[in-house]
Amino acid sequence: MVGTAEGGAERAVRRWVDAAGGRLVLDGGLATELEANGADLNDPLWSAKCLLSSPHLIRKVHMDYLEAGANIIITASYQATIQGFESKGFSKEQSENLLTKSVQIALEAREMFLKEHLEKSTPIQHPILVAAALGSYGAYLADGSEYSGDYGEAGTKEFLKDFHRRRLQVLAEAGPDLIAFETIPNKLEAQAYVELLEECNINIPSWLSFNSKDGVHVVSGDSLIECATIADKCAKVGAVGINCTPPRFIHGLILSIRKVTDKPILIYPNSGERYDGEKKEWVESTGVSDGDFVSYVNEWCKDGAALIGGCCRTTPNTIRAIHRTLNQGCHKHQLPVA
């Protein structure tokens, strides 16, 4: 386990970035790929439903992203919570075991991928990492509030800490390389996360990733700069960034984050399609093609992004194109030095 005392989390992420040649490639959308492989995700558990019904599909999607060039695969735990599983009739122990299973599946996929390439005499020389995903409280509610940050009466820091505490501990104990706090919609939840990292003494690097719908603020209306500052001040946070946000906003968001932190910046936008929180569906024909998506990559590199991938509605083809673009020269852009 990588220590995170005195900036160790940031150093760990930078070592991985350097070992990959200057940039790390994240994977892409999980839920849409599971659906493309036949999974039925019409459930509040969303992709976490497959931990119960079809773990083999999760493993396959992880493998598809690794074959496409991803250095980091993110577990199917974004919407997996103890409270959510208990609402389905599972005991606390069973719920915790399902969280652990999400990490185990990703670790198995990595082992299979490395073994296959070793047997082909094409051993993998770059880092292959597993990030355990923690979605926001709004993701558990499955009512679209992860895209608004409006939690109503539940919107207190202590409530959020109590909600996430055991989930964070279980995922960290399962053995991932990183903890990924994803799609953070407001400043309050970011503060809850960094306090939990300290209180629970989580000794593996984490990242905090926010979402924006206007290119200036996080979706709640809170200042992105203030949110990034919270992440910057926590030694257990190794990277700060943006996910589930249209590609056209990323340039300005990276520049805003760089004003307040020297930590590595990660970005994994969605396809640009608009999500209808009431209907719980993506609005067709509102996004960009893989070609248009990848056309932004060189700009993001110049801006200083160190970890680049995709979020909702991106596919292994998107990640393959990002990987190809990075190999064609994006690495030559110098990263900011801490």
Swiss-Prot record:
This molecule's function is given as: Catalyzes methyl transfer from S-methylmethionine (SMM) to adenosyl-L-homocysteine (AdoMet). SMM degradation (by HMT-1, HMT-2, HMT-3 and HMT-4) and biosynthesis (by MMT1) constitute the SMM cycle in plants, which is probably required to achieve short term control of AdoMet level.
Q: What is its EC number?
A: 2.1.1.10
- Enumerate the residues binding Zn(2+): C244, C311, C312
Provide the assembly information: Monomer.
Point out the gene that encodes the protein. Answer: HMT-3
Sorted alphabetically, which SUPFAM superfamilies does this protein's record hold? Homocysteine S-methyltransferase
Pfam family, any one = S-methyl_trans
Where does the record place the Hcy-binding domain?
12-326
Q: What name goes with this protein?
A: Homocysteine S-methyltransferase 3
Q: Per the UniProt entry, what is one GO biological process?
A: methylation
Q: Does the keyword Kinase apply?
A: no
NCBIfam families of this UniProt entry?
A: PRK09485.1
Q: Which PROSITE patterns match?
A: HCY (PS50970)
Q: Which GO terms describe its molecular function?
A: S-methylmethionine-homocysteine S-methyltransferase activity; zinc ion binding
Q: Does the keyword Oxidoreductase apply?
A: no
Q: Which reaction does it catalyse?
A: S-methyl-L-methionine + L-homocysteine = 2 L-methionine + H(+)
InterPro entries the record matches: Betaine-hCys_S-MeTrfase_BHMT, HCY_dom, HCY_dom_sf, Hcy_S-methyltransferase
Q: Which cofactor does it need?
A: Zn(2+)
UniProt keyword list: Amino-acid biosynthesis, Metal-binding, Methionine biosynthesis, Methyltransferase, S-adenosyl-L-methionine, Transferase, Zinc
